[in-house]
Regions:
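Asp-box/BNR beta-propeller blade signature and adjacent active/binding-site loops
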Residues: 1-348
């Protein structure tokens, strides 16, 4: 499988003054090859002025960003866009911190020009239900699968939320993981954001006691056979598999891909072909560069690096990837000051 980069653009004007920091983008394709991209932004991650912002890509140009979800004094996080039958869904988290965030959803029937009032995704449930970072999977049986996770002060755990009625109700299915005590953490090659207080939690003793997996990226290899690849605290990506449309999962297990405890995303192209965007770096909270694209032709058993999107020191993180025909659309965080968009063409 061959990949070629055809477009690389900043979503925001260079040197903009819309906000101090931006992070965690999501991308969705509308009919006619048009795109919508959302992210959270404000003074810094976790600050009360963070909001969800949206930009449109049409005829090769990005629109000025607009703020589409905000509430003064309440941190907003990790938007996920989903397009279904003429309706644009926006899922996102709100809360004082990640341990206590909850999920809200808004809908647009005019491609993001206007939005419904926010509502809880699962009324009465204070857990962070629904998608946590990566896109929904619409399975072959028509059900929606939302890759999800929860983080407390010690343990990180992934799960999926399943909807048989197109997002009206959700059923939670856990992904098993045996937790262990975190190992020793060398301070070399750490992500610079830890030193610069870019993370919502600045107590590094607490940060390094977290153990587990979060932020799954999901695909269906054949009807009912569903898989997730997950970020971990353990220096490698973890995987879990299901044979019953995501209702039951095997114990999560490490695969032969490094992970720096930062988000990844992948897309399934059929016939066992997968394209993954990730930081090929091993270590807990290690540096967030380079940013690379890897390919698999055997449903994730083996991987080969195909492209490097960013090589210089910096933070290039939290990628999102979707497929639209033979084009792959990728967005990612650029030093928390911008969002980069890349178009890749695949063949073979």
């Amino acid at each position: 499988m061959r990949l070629t980069t055809t477009t690389r653009q900043y979503v925001l004007p260079e040197g903009h003054d819309y906000f101090g920091n931006c992070h965690a983008s999501t991308v969705v394709a509308l009919p006619g090859g048009r795109l919508r991209v959302a992210w959270f932004a404000g003074e810094k991650e976790g600050s009360g002025d963070t909001a969800i912002w949206l930009a449109s890509h049409e005829q090769g140009r990005w629109s000025p960003p607009v703020r589409v979800a905000w509430e003064d004094g309440l941190a907003h996080w990790n938007p996920v866009l989903h397009w279904q039958a003429g309706t644009l869904w926006l899922f996102y988290k709100v809360g004082a911190d990640v341990h206590h965030w909850q999920t809200r959803v808004q809908l647009s029937t005019d491609e993001g020009a206007s939005w419904s009032a926010p509502r809880p995704l699962v009324p009465g449930d204070s857990a962070p239900r629904g998608p946590v970072k990566n896109k929904l999977l619409v399975m072959s049986n028509g059900e929606w699968l939302a890759p999800a996770s929860v983080e407390d002060d010690r343990h990180w755990d992934a799960f999926v939320d399943l909807s048989a009625d197109q997002g009206q109700s959700w059923q939670r299915a856990p992904i098993p993981l045996t937790h262990r005590l975190p190992g020793e953490h060398g301070r070399e090659a750490l992500w610079s954001g830890l030193e610069q207080a870019a993370l919502w939690e600045n107590d590094l003793a607490r940060v390094f006691q977290w153990d587990g997996v979060i932020q799954p990226s999901a695909w269906e290899s054949s009807p009912g056979r569903v898989h997730v690849l997950m970020r971990s605290t353990r220096g490698a990506l973890y995987r879990s598999d299901s044979d019953d449309f995501g209702r039951h999962w095997c114990e999560a297990y490490a695969v032969g891909l490094p992970n720096n405890n930062s988000g990844v995303d992948l897309v399934h192209l059929g016939a066992g072909r997968l394209v993954l965007v990730y930081n090929p770096v091993t270590g807990n909270w290690h540096r967030r560069y380079p940013l690379a694209v890897a390919c698999s032709t055997d449903n994730g058993e083996h991987w080969q690096d195909a492209l490097c999107l960013e090589q210089e020191p910096g933070e290039f993180s939290y990628p999102a990837i979707i497929a639209d025909g033979d084009t792959l659309h990728v967005t990612y965080t650029w030093n928390r000051k911008n969002i980069v968009y890349c178009a890749l063409i695949f063949s073979g």
